[in-house]
Structure formats: structure tokens, C-alpha cells
Amino acid sequence: MKKLVIATRGSKLALWQAEHVKSCIEGQHPGVSVELLVLKTRGDIILDVPLAKVGGKGLFVKEIEEALLDGRADLAVHSMKDVPMELPEGLVLGIIPEREEPSDTFLSVHHDSLAALPHGATVGTSSLRRQSQLLALRPDLNVVSLRGNVDTRLRKLSEGQFDAIIMATAGMKRLGLSAPRSEVLGPPAFLPAVGQGALGIEFRADRADLHELLAFMEHTPTRIRVEAERGFLAGLQGGCQVPIAGHAVMTGDGTFALEGLVADLTGARVIRRTMNGVSAPDGAQARQIGLDLAAQLVADGAGEILAEVYGSGEAVN
């Protein structure tokens, strides 16, 4: 019996994702057993500070990647929106499975929708991207930081600390969670984070055996979409905690449309553009389209907006 070890965070959602991949592997390969190695990342430990102020990239993956490099684990399962643009040398995102719904969801106890919230209502989110888009739609809202795991966020909502909260639809669906009232916030009105709803399976580049073993999970349309979105984010020198949104959809066999957005923290300035492209299954051309779209937004003024967000006077270019 061949044994594999999956490195994962210990949150309910991370464990669901790792267990899902474990189940897929063992179902496809009866001669393989899979164990989980649960690790705490910096992002899991620092819970009293808004993510945007913690600083650094890879808040939810660094410790997991170290386990891959030192041999404690064979593979890791990540939420793609948490994976930095540059991977450590020797590691690859070898497999990207089929994507779940990439949208966000509005959750409330008393209000049916974002539009139904009273003037000045308090909305909780951990994301500057959501904050910017919320304020662009509803400048009157009081948007405040909301950290913690899924259960903690829903508990704070039910206790009345917030009139509403915004969470990723995929996480809610995967864990079978809901709130008394909800509304899907999706494209084109509300763009998701780059890679939101997609999983990535990371392992060492020299593990050709894993690439072969896990190839059945690869989903080419999802890889093309995710590579396009990640190219866009890379071109803006962004991480997962900036007011940048990107969403790609397949429009044909290998063809896609990518929409990108950059906003200031108040939602007063929003720059968004769309670009069409075509890509081979590995997503290389899609990534270049993402870079090209980023350059277009920078030319339109996105660099100045991001310079203000990053706290420097030097524009991204």
C-alpha cells in the first residue's frame, strides 16, 4: 500500500478541502492510503489584526510549503486565492481541480439583500476587495474588519455584532452552511478574488509520480481561468489582501474573457476592463493575457490607486 501525506491548515474549510482530495485519491487509486498533516500558519495564529495590516505574502501557505520541501508531506491542498504569485523554488501547482462557484455571498439575520440594508448598516468582511466594491455600491455602509473561522464569523452575525457579513460562496457550499437570509454577490456587479472557489494541489517539481497519480483531477478550463486571473494579479504586484478583483470565464474551446478591477479603499475610484484571449491547456498564454490586462489598467490609473493602498507615493508600473 502506497502512503501519501497531505499538508493542510486546521480550519474546518481547509480540512474539508484536504479530506475531499484524500477521498478522490483513495477512490481513484484503491492501493493508495492518504493521511493528513495539520499545520498552523501565520495567518491562522494572528487573528486580532486585519489581514491587510499583517503584512507579507503567503500568510496561509508558508509553513505548509516548508513541509513539502523538507519531506514531511507529499502534497498540499490550498485555496487558490491564498497562494502567492511566486512559488518557492522546487514547488509547482501541479494540479488544479474543477472550480466551485467563485462568487461571494451576502449573509444576514434580518435583511434580504445588500440593497435592503438600512442606511449606515455595519457589514463585516476580511477583504479589502469586498470593502471597496461594497462601498462603491453603498457608500453609506460602515464596513469593518471581520476575522476568524467560518463558525466564528457566523456566530458574530447571529449575536448582532453585524447587520450583515460577506463570505465566499464556495466555502459556504462546501461546509453546508447558511444564514437566515442571503444573496449571491457575483459578476458582473461584484467581482471575486483571483482564484476564488478554486483549489490548487502543490507538490515538489521532481515528483513526476504525483503528477501522474493525480492527473485525473486536473480540470483544464479551471486552470486556464485561474492562470489568467493570477497573471492579472501578478502584473499589479498584488497579493490576496489588496482591492484587486479578477474573473475569467470560458467562452469557447480554449478561449476566455478576463475582467479585472482595481479600486481605492473607499470605492470612489474603480477601474475595470475586460480582455479576451485564447490559451493552451497549461494556461501559459492565459497568464500573459492577465499581465496584458494589468498593464492596461495601470495605464488607466490603477498604479496610482495601488500606490496609495500600499502606503507609498510610488505608483505600480
Swiss-Prot record:
Cofactors: dipyrromethane
Alphabetical UniProt keywords: Porphyrin biosynthesis, Transferase
TM stretches of this protein: none
Location of S-(dipyrrolylmethanemethyl)cysteine modifications: C240
Catalyses which reaction(s): 4 porphobilinogen + H2O = hydroxymethylbilane + 4 NH4(+)
Cofactor note: Binds 1 dipyrromethane group covalently.
PROSITE patterns linked: PORPHOBILINOGEN_DEAM (PS00533)
Pathway, per record: Porphyrin-containing compound metabolism; protoporphyrin-IX biosynthesis; coproporphyrinogen-III from 5-aminolevulinate: step 2/4
GO biological process, one term: protoporphyrinogen IX biosynthetic process
Domain of life: Bacteria
SUPFAM superfamilies linked to this entry: Periplasmic binding protein-like II, Porphobilinogen deaminase (hydroxymethylbilane synthase), C-terminal domain
Cellular component terms per the entry's GO annotation: cytoplasm
InterPro entries (alphabetical): HemC, Porphobilin_deaminase_cofac_BS, Porphobilin_deaminase_N, Porphobilinogen_deaminase_C, Porphobilinogen_deaminase_C_sf
EC number: 2.5.1.61
Pfam families given in the database record: Porphobil_deam, Porphobil_deamC
MF terms in GO: hydroxymethylbilane synthase activity
HAMAP family associated with the record: Porphobil_deam (MF_00260)
Oligomeric form and interacting partners: Monomer.
Protein function: Tetrapolymerization of the monopyrrole PBG into the hydroxymethylbilane pre-uroporphyrinogen in several discrete steps.
Record protein name field: Porphobilinogen deaminase
Organism: Nitratidesulfovibrio vulgaris (strain DSM 19637 / Miyazaki F) (Desulfovibrio vulgaris)
Gene: hemC
